[in-house]
Swiss-Prot record:
It comes from Staphylococcus aureus (strain NCTC 8325 / PS 47). This is Elongation factor Tu. The lineage of its organism: Bacteria, Bacillati, Bacillota, Bacilli, Bacillales. Residues 81-84 are annotated as: G3. Residues 174-176 are annotated as: G5. Coiled coil: none annotated. The keyword Hydrolase applies. GTP hydrolase that promotes the GTP-dependent binding of aminoacyl-tRNA to the A-site of ribosomes during protein biosynthesis. One of its GO terms (biological process) is translational elongation. Residues 10-204 form the tr-type G domain.
Length: 394
């Protein structure tokens, strides 16, 4: 069978289902695919196909996730669903499945539960831009007032974590009934997708963002100058443009006088390209692995930040023992390790392998970071944790 051509004319977005265990995330995922399949926009997926999520390795961490795709009239979606709570935590922190938006599933019969709260907090911390709510299992609730109460609770909870609780679309339905083909509830799934289409903002493509390239290697070409190589993480770079060299030392400016890829000279390079950038007036020792080349003013070096961190369990090859405040591991940002000191939040004595925690980190050298920058925590070259920057302190 010939592979279908990927349709680029539609906007693409990555979304996922989040919420408390057994509130119906996987059933909803199956229902969306199945209902949209009737419109010819998707391939029907059974609950079991989605629930038996394959294991994936991301930064050495084992995560179970199911990826399915479907389309609405407006967009093409890649949808991620995780079977277990721990998988969600790992997924969101490592960014294994980047989410441009989320569907928060809350059982109308139970209302918000501990993981509902935790998933909202995680979404806020790792920078999921928008959430839409699906109140599930409404067929099990006879009392209209109870439904309104649950909706109010969910809205308050979202507001508590800085999502616009009053404006978030809330759609009430039954994923199971929709999956069974009940027309009234199928309509609710279409209503939900309409809300996702309109309320979740179109993600900015990597190539439209300001230029940044982590430096992987540096060498000098006699008579031409210094070349920094790496993969362009975002944006574009044209020959003749100015860039800043950021991190580890004081920031300096230079001009890119040549861009090379696979030994061919290019006029410009964009996100995803592996390139060599020829830098004007830069000595070989002025640029090193671990720094980034970036559009002037787009990103700044910092030494202190808050982060949401997942600590690998012993089974994942992580630590066998807990750690405490003043723990000093290596923080691996993009292409290099930098030593840092961990400060745990008040009331947290220690962190056990398998936990997730919000911590403050102080690095011994400045690194180009911003909200949403991902990193690994390492000890002697092995990964013991994974994190994402949630707030810059200095």
């Amino acid at each position: 069978m010939a592979k279908e051509k990927f349709d680029r004319s539609k906007e693409h977005a990555n979304i996922g289902t989040i919420g408390h265990v057994d509130h119906g995330k996987t059933t909803l995922t199956a229902a969306i695919a199945t209902v949209l399949a009737k419109n010819g926009d998707s391939v029907a997926q059974s609950y079991d196909m989605i629930d038996n999520a394959p294991e994936e390795k991301e930064r050495g961490i084992t995560i179970n996730t199911s990826h399915i795709e479907y389309q609405t009239d407006k967009r093409h979606y890649a949808h991620v669903d995780c079977p277990g709570h721990a998988d969600y935590v790992k997924n969101m922190i490592t960014g294994a499945a980047q989410m441009d938006g989320g569907i928060l599933v809350v059982s109308a019969a139970d209302g918000p539960m501990p993981q509902t709260r935790e998933h909202i907090l995680l979404s806020r911390n790792v920078g999921v831009p928008a959430l839409v709510v699906f109140l599930n299992k409404v067929d099990m609730v006879d009392d209209e007032e109870l439904l309104e109460l649950v909706e109010m609770e969910v809205r308050d909870l979202l507001s508590e974590y800085d999502f616009p609780g009053d404006d978030v679309p809330v759609i009430a339905g039954s994923a199971l009934k929709a999956l069974e083909g009940d027309a009234q509830y199928e309509e609710k799934i279409l209503e939900l997708m309409e809300a996702v289409d309109t309320y979740i903002p179109t993600p900015e493509r990597d190539s439209d963002k300001p230029f940044m390239m982590p430096v992987e290697d540096v060498f000098s070409i006699t008579g031409r100058g210094t070349v920094a190589t790496g993969r362009v993480e975002r944006g574009q770079i044209k020959v003749g443009e100015e860039v800043e060299i950021i991190g580890l030392h004081d920031t300096s400016k230079t001009t890119v006088t040549g861009v090379e890829m696979f030994r061919k000279l290019l006029d410009y390079a964009e996100a995803g390209d592996n390139i060599g950038a020829l830098l004007r007036g830069v000595a070989r020792e002025d640029v090193q692995r671990g720094q980034v080349l970036a559009a002037p003013g787009s990103i700044t070096p910092h030494t202190e930040f808050k982060a949401e961190v997942y600590v690998l369990s012993k089974d994942e090859g992580g630590r066998h023992t807990p750690f405490f405040s003043n723990y000093r591991p290596q923080f691996y940002f993009r292409t290099t390790d930098v030593t840092g000191v961990v400060h745990l939040p008040e009331g947290t004595e220690m962190v056990m392998p398998g936990d997730n925690v919000e911590m403050t980190v102080e690095l011994i050298a400045p690194i180009a970071i911003e909200d949403g920058t991902r990193f690994s925590i390492r000890e002697g070259g092995r990964t013991v944790g994974s994190g994402v920057v949630t707030e810059i302190i200095k």
